Amino acid sequence: MAALTASCIDLNIQGNGAYSVLKQLATIALQNGFITDSHQFLQTLLLREKMHSTGFGSGVAVPHGKSACVKQPFVLFARKAQAIDWKASDGEDVNCWICLGVPQSGEEDQVKIIGTLCRKIIHKEFIHQLQQGDTDQVLALLNQTLSS
């Protein structure tokens, strides 16, 4: 997986619901050249949310999906000041999203990346850094996490 760059991070994502946030994440993935079709990837993310919320807890969601439109594994990060209902496991609204996309054949990559993120998301300091950090801080935090 390629390292995240500043163009993979949106600290002021717009939208008041799952559809609008996921649509913007799919657009960011397309703009970064990670996918070939933003609509197809959006449908993948929406289907995953319909099966079970990706709201991990503590204000963080990890929307993810495998799709033929994904060219290489990638991670994006988005945040907004106002949290929105994401039907998270702890009932808290979400204001941070770590979005993961992998090619259709990327089951192993997906499991590895989600496992790495989940081991970090349980720590309050990690969440605090995601919620408060500037672009450079979030970039360094996620790149360090994903390379370990």
Swiss-Prot record:
Please list the residue ranges annotated as the PTS EIIA type-2 domain.
2-145
Identify the main location: cytoplasm
Q: Which residues form a coiled coil?
A: none
Output the GO biological process annotations, alphabetical, semicolon-separated. fructose import across plasma membrane; phosphoenolpyruvate-dependent sugar phosphotransferase system
Matching Pfam families: PTS_EIIA_2
Which residues carry out catalysis? 64 (tele-phosphohistidine intermediate)
Cellular component GO terms held in the UniProt record: cytoplasm; transmembrane transporter complex
Which pairs are disulfide-linked?
none
Instruction: Identify the InterPro entries for this entry.
Output: PTrfase/Anion_transptr (IPR016152), PTS_EIIA_type-2_dom (IPR002178), PTS_IIA_fruc (IPR004715), PTS_SugarTrans_NitroReg (IPR051541)
Give the UniProt subcellular location, in the record's own words. Cytoplasm
The organism's place on the tree of life at top rank: Bacteria
| Phosphohistidine: residues carrying this PTM | 64
Gene Ontology MF annotations: kinase activity; protein-N(PI)-phosphohistidine-sugar phosphotransferase activity
Keywords (alphabetical) are:
Cytoplasm, Kinase, Phosphoprotein, Phosphotransferase system, Sugar transport, Transferase, Transport
What's this protein's function?
The phosphoenolpyruvate-dependent sugar phosphotransferase system (sugar PTS), a major carbohydrate active transport system, catalyzes the phosphorylation of incoming sugar substrates concomitantly with their translocation across the cell membrane. The enzyme II FrvAB PTS system is involved in fructose transport.
- In the UniProt entry, what is the domain comment? The PTS EIIA type-2 domain is phosphorylated by phospho-HPr on a histidyl residue. Then, it transfers the phosphoryl group to the PTS EIIB type-2 domain.
What is the name of this protein? PTS system fructose-like EIIA component
Q: Which organism is it from?
A: Escherichia coli (strain K12)
The organism's taxonomy opens as: Bacteria, Pseudomonadati, Pseudomonadota, Gammaproteobacteria, Enterobacterales
